[in-house]
């Protein structure tokens, strides 16, 4: 009888403890498992804690149903001593780690969006991206500038004038005096249609920033690269982003010229010229931009990865950016059910390949290394709080106009080159930033519309969703954000699991990621 009373007393005491710390709410956390252990990710502190099985199961029960039923379910599987042990460990975690005490976001408020915006935009601009021309000698089937895609401009014929370019460079000069880095990027269309223009911009930038270092880089489809151009890029220390989607048949099925012909051979010629010219610097200065296109399959991913076997001169440690086509850009006829059905998606392939390399059971690959190392580096370098902190970054949004601006051919300012052409402009080279638009549309409205959705989300501290996904229609689109949320949650769940699996195998093996520079 005494034992029963003691048990009931402890259960009642435990209920009072949970009611006191949770006040009838459920903390915002993510419980997940690997094959070897159970884990808790706590949103309030950004911490990951390993849990004993009894602790994990008790938390699962408490989070999934009302308290009396949760405890009854727990005691149907575990002994009373395991219940006491689980509760005591939870008490210690609450007291010493500050976890299980965050119940939702009341504000974003953590990022520079909420500082002195005018002062930041007046002094810390870091990068210009110049839309050198709207013209392009290619017509890739998934290009956002195709007539079938409603959220971007169509293929155009306009070129940026030197007047606009020089005014943009002057603007960078006068608005970057507190910035740690300054860069001018050339974009299109295809910027190499105007190589002379690029040279003029580089020389003007050097004259304006005579005592300050400025980086230059370019994004190109590669078909116009000559030895002269490669030499110029190397001399001026250009990183070059060049587009190639895989072996010839895969690349040529989507990346065509204006006459409908494949472009693989011309791209490879340009790429080979760059690699030879850059020599030992090629791996650090050349970035491949790849688009993973239908029909989706594990076999297709393997064939794309085999590009390095077909081009043995391609550096094995090259950086790679690989993505799916942007939502809505693919021609409707290609998107049949069979084409888009995936038995192994790209992210899963990247995780499996990276995990095998890490554990020594397989070889790595430049694609999987680039995919996973960046995500893991962001997670490793996250801010960890000793107690719940009720301020959060504005998802993955940059501060409009702070890190970079995209300058269109006519001198208008956009947040970046990826955002919809219908999204609100943030200024122009003649008048500067439109602070009111930045504050109202991109900060206040984004927060007001997002907070009800984000406030109860366990991934709010890890989220990479930004203006690109949410301003497709010209104003904040909550439906578009919700579609992105599903994929983001799935991706972050996988990231947590991968991180924990790798730490189980070698706790120090990821330390090199602390040195990865994140933008």
Residue spans of the language-model regions?
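Short Fe-S-cluster ligation motifs
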Residues: 167-185, 481-519
């Amino acid at each position: 009888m005494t034992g029963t009373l003691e048990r009931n007393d402890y259960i009642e005491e435990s209920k009072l403890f949970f009611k006191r710390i949770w006040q009838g709410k459920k903390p915002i956390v993510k419980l997940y498992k690997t094959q070897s252990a159970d884990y808790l990710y706590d949103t309030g502190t950004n911490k990951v804690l390993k849990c004993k099985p009894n602790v994990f199961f008790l938390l699962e029960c408490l989070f999934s149903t009302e308290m009396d039923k949760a405890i009854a379910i727990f005691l149907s599987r575990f002994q009373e001593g395991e219940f006491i042990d689980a509760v005591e460990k939870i008490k210690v975690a609450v007291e010493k780690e500050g976890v299980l005490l965050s119940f939702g976001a009341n504000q974003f408020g953590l990022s520079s969006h909420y500082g002195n915006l005018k002062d930041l935009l007046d002094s810390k601009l870091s990068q210009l991206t110049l839309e050198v021309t709207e013209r392009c000698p290619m017509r890739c089937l998934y290009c956002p500038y195709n007539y079938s895609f409603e959220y971007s401009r169509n293929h155009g014929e306009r070129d940026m004038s030197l007047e606009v370019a020089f005014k943009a460079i002057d603007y960078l000069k006068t608005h970057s005096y507190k910035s740690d880095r300054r860069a001018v990027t050339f974009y299109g269309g295809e910027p190499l249609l105007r190589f002379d223009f690029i040279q003029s911009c580089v020389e003007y930038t050097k004259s304006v920033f005579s005592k300050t270092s400025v980086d230059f880089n370019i994004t190109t489809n590669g078909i116009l690269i000559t030895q002269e151009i490669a030499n110029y890029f190397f001399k001026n220390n250009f990183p070059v982003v060049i587009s190639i989607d895989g072996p010839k048949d895969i690349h040529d099925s989507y990346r065509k010229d204006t006459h409908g012909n494949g472009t693989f051979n011309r791209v490879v010629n340009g790429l080979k010229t760059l690699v030879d010219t850059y020599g030992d610097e090629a791996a650090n200065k050349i970035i491949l931009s790849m688009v993973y296109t239908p029909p989706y399959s594990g076999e297709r991913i393997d064939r794309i990865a085999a590009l390095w076997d077909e081009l043995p001169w391609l550096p094995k440690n090259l950086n790679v950016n690989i993505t799916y086509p942007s939502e809505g850009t693919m021609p409707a006829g290609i998107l049949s059910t069979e084409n888009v059905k995936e038995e192994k998606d790209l992210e899963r392939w990247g995780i499996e390949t990276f995990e095998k390399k890490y554990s020594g059971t397989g070889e790595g690959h430049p694609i999987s290394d680039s995919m996973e190392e960046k995500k893991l580096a962001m997670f490793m370098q996250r801010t960890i709080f000793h107690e719940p902190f009720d301020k959060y970054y504005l998802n993955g949004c940059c501060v409009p106009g702070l890190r970079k601006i995209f300058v269109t051919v006519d001198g208008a300012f956009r947040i970046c080159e990826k955002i919809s052409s219908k999204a609100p402009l943030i200024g122009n080279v003649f008048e500067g930033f439109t602070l009111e638009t930045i504050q109202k549309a991109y900060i206040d409205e984004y927060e007001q519309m997002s907070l009800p959705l984000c406030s109860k989300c366990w991934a709010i501290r890890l989220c990479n969703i930004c203006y690109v996904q949410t301003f497709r229609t010209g104003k904040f689109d909550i439906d578009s954000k919700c579609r992105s949320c599903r994929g983001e949650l799935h991706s972050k769940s996988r990231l947590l699991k991968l991180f924990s699996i790798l730490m189980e195998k070698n706790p120090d093996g990821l330390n090199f990621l602390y040195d990865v520079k994140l933008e």
